[in-house]
């Protein structure tokens, strides 16, 4: 594990169900047992605010986990980069930002949103081994039973020339000379 910090983000709206679970003794204990010592929570517009700034472990190893929170930030990139684990809502933008940063991710689906797009995206990316996908009710269990988070598959680097090659192929330019930026 590169960092002992967990970053939790709910996005720009509210996801109190996620914040409440993170704030529970069971979840904090599960994180502590995984070696995490600090949790930073981005609350969004939610109403649940953690009342404590630390949790003292109950397990055999004891330990303590610090808890910090804030509402919004112009960018979450540094929080993501500084984390050893991100626990996030299932929004596509956040999922992709975390995967591109190559930080282990647990995506928590907000079932109160319309449609099922978060479950579809999270489920597919979990099936491909890139993240763990769960719900607020199953988060603690997922954290307790997950294998080594470092074994999640990294998101592949972008192929910036793929679209151009596809266009060339579709237009019949497969034998065309390389573009200047390809050389």
For the regions a language model picked out, list residue spans one by one.
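A donor-sugar binding/catalytic signature common to diverse glycosyltransferases
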Residues: 76-115
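Active-site-proximal loop->helix
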Residues: 110-133
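Acidic/polar active-site rim loop that often engages polyanionic ligands
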Residues: 101-105, 124, 148-149
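Short, structured coil segments at secondary-structure junctions
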Residues: 35, 65, 101-102, 128-129
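CheY-like receiver
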Residues: 79-82, 141-146
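Donor-nucleotide binding loops and adjacent catalytic segments primarily
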Residues: 2-82
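Short acidic-hydrophobic, aromatic-tinged amphipathic segments that line or gate anion-handling sites
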Residues: 68-71, 131-142
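C-terminal amphipathic helix plus adjacent low-complexity
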Residues: 146-183
